[in-house]
Amino acid sequence: MGSRASNSPSFSSKAETLLPSEYKKNAVKKETIRNGKKRKLPDTESSDPEFASRRLIANETGTDAVSNGNKNDSNANNNNNNNNKKSSEVMHQACDACRKKKWKCSKTVPTCTNCLKYNLDCVYSPQVVRTPLTRAHLTEMENRVAELEQFLKELFPVWDIDRLLQQKDTYRIRELLTMGSTNTVPGLASNNIDSSLEQPVAFGTAQPAQSLSTDPAVQSQAYPMQPVPMTELQSITNLRHTPSLLDEQQMNTISTATLRNMYSSGNNNNNLGNISGLSPVTEAFFRWQEGETSIDNSYFGKGSILFWLNQLLSSEKIAGVTSKVGNDINTNNNNINHQKLPLILNNNITHNVSDITTTSTSSNKRAMSPLSANDSVYLAKRETISAYIDAYFKHYHALYPLVSKEMFFAQYNDQIKPENVEIWHILLNAVLALGSWCSNSCSSHHTLYYQNALSYLSTAVLETGSTDLTIALILLTHYVQKMHKPNTAWSLIGLCSHMATSLGLHRDLPNSTIHDQQLRRVLWWTIYCTGCDLSLETGRPSLLPNLQAIDIPLPASSATIKEPSIYSSIIQESQWSQILQQKLSNNSYQQSAGECLSWFDSVQAFLDHWPTPSTEAELKALNETQLDWLPLVKFRPYWMFHCSLISLFSVFFEEDAPTDNNVIRCKELCLQLSSRNIFSVATFVRSYAFNSLSCWYATHYLVRSALVPLHFASRISPQHALWETVKAQLLSAHEAMGILSQESSLAAKFDGILTKNYSEILQREGINKSQLMPPPTPLLQSTSFSDLLSLWSANAEDAPRVSNSQMPQSITITDSLLQSSTTQMRPPTTSGWPDTNNFLNPSTQQLFNTTTMDDVYNYIFDNDE
């Protein structure tokens, strides 16, 4: 035994490899550290196999049985109890420093030997517990998930768990679970949940917070349950099945009182929305994002045009509409530039442009490629910027004369130093964005100027109030509205209107100059008109002050002079916006059909006061003025008036089969308004050349007007009295959209919808006519007229013989016949008798539906009986 111990390799030699038989012997020579001192084992321990065996047992049991190896067993047991405290101080793994350096760690606490020697921070990381990759563990997890799903179904029997899991917002899920679990505790059955739901929680009543876990650590992290009104609990319908979609088992678990509380308004505390006449909200929460990643879940009022647009285009009754067409029409993000491009503008200021998302209604024939470095250099050139500024004042300034041309060019040419350089660059980039878009340039250029304008909106700028900043904000609002971003436009118009009222733009300042008065009037009424238009389009409460708090007059115009004025458009729009704002403030969406008709009669005189050019002389006179902006100025107010009325009356389209005569009159009135608008837009696009601005307005109002005949076409039959009117409107809208689609991708998309619906109308009309045709006359058992023709014809041997069994029984009018047939009824001859030569020609078989001798007799002798 001693020879084997002496021949064993040394413990300090790390390069040598220990054999398995020698490992146990050398294990007794391990150096142990106690209180920072090394203790060397006696030689007897290394040579005596009894001590070696005791050391192995100590390593396995965690006791130090070798320290008193020469004593008896009773003394050894006592020492083991005393040394348990020392062994507990040894960590389960090496410290972080030893693991990083690949050192052998003593695993002592608080500091190991190596860290103490080299003066290092000794830190022991928690041991990582890895999931076992076994079938048993996977089965256990599957069973646990199934139990959790069943537990959630018992807690929330009317919720769709799959849709709940799709929610990515963890905080929002906690809120929904908190609202849904009010007055519930784990383990309750479905009937107990029903009883708790039957007792609605009054708003402001304190409720105890319930936790889904008994662990105090988990309870401390849980969100407390806040008192929630029952209306908010009822509004979480996107995570629930509707009652019609619930299966029989779930319907049995829900009591009748629960459904009555969830889908009715029986409690006064929870009926605030119904008291004010508002429609119930059908979403659990709203969220929108109109940047690179589009999220369209914003709130639109039930009577708004955007709500109706989404509902109608997502309906299965409209042909050619996919599930995402409504979103594509409202938001069209096609081009993304992921490069950060510098843009050098006036005053030698370089600004970095953030990532750009291009949204445009530019031509679908033009390629929309991302911006390159050459494009950024081109857009920063003095010539390019000057061209876009000229385009702005040529096209957009005629509609909204907001910018003082003299002051703007004085600052642009460095003749006047701007008061705030950042605000000046916001205004300059806003002008460039609209000018670039109006000039039919590459669709991705204007987005660079827009993003550059936003980059200057710093905290210092938002803490400043000035007229120039207000002008820049309203121009940015118009820009994002043209890019089909209604939510961003709504946010900007709110900021703009609040800044305008803080500057007192809604009040008249008699001591100011005429130029300043005109500028303040135009700016305020532009903000007012834009806010009213967005409020009507989205169905949201207006942010504008009451008319009683506004005393600033309308802009002055040369109305007595026959020359056109750039203030005509804003004056007409302001007058109409005042009428609409007064209507919206009276909760117009909840007025009856009779009240709406009475209100329409009161504004009929105003609509007649601003007619649109319709005669050929008036249309020609607009072209002779050689003012590109004048046709749009003349037509756009007319379109706006009618689309506003359509939006107000669209709330009555929810009833498919109304019984109230006033509701029927309101729907027919919408059809008349849409007819005027559609034919007016069609006249405009056929008579005048248009740019991006006029194309956008024509498409914008044509889409909203064409929704009315689309609604009627999906709900009436060809025998209806309005069928021909609907058909004519769809055809005219289709022709106008075809012209606009050359410059607008949005028009091209909607034109596809109109084309498919018009084809479906022709198909329905053809099928209906074939069904209404009288049954064919029974064939007689005599010789048919076709047989006689074969005998009378000079080419009798070449003419085919048609038997009675081969004769068609009826004629079906198909779409191809309706679209391509140009054959008219043959007028009678001068003598009153039919042409004999044509009569004897075999080709005249097509004149008869049947070939009986009665028809031949009636045809020859002109007998109508």
Curated annotation (Swiss-Prot):
Compartments where located: Nucleus
Signal peptide feature range: none
Positions of the DNA-binding region: 95-122
Stretches for region Disordered: 1-87, 818-840
Record keywords, A-Z: Activator, Carbohydrate metabolism, DNA-binding, Galactose metabolism, Metal-binding, Nucleus, Transcription, Transcription regulation, Zinc
Biased segments, Polar residues type: 1-15
SMART domains associated with the record: Fungal_trans, GAL4
Biased composition (Basic and acidic residues): 22-34
Function of the protein: Positive regulatory protein, that controls induction of the lactose-galactose regulation of Kluyveromyces lactis.
Name of the featured protein: Lactose regulatory protein LAC9
Source species: Kluyveromyces lactis (strain ATCC 8585 / CBS 2359 / DSM 70799 / NBRC 1267 / NRRL Y-1140 / WM37)
Gene from which this protein is expressed: LAC9
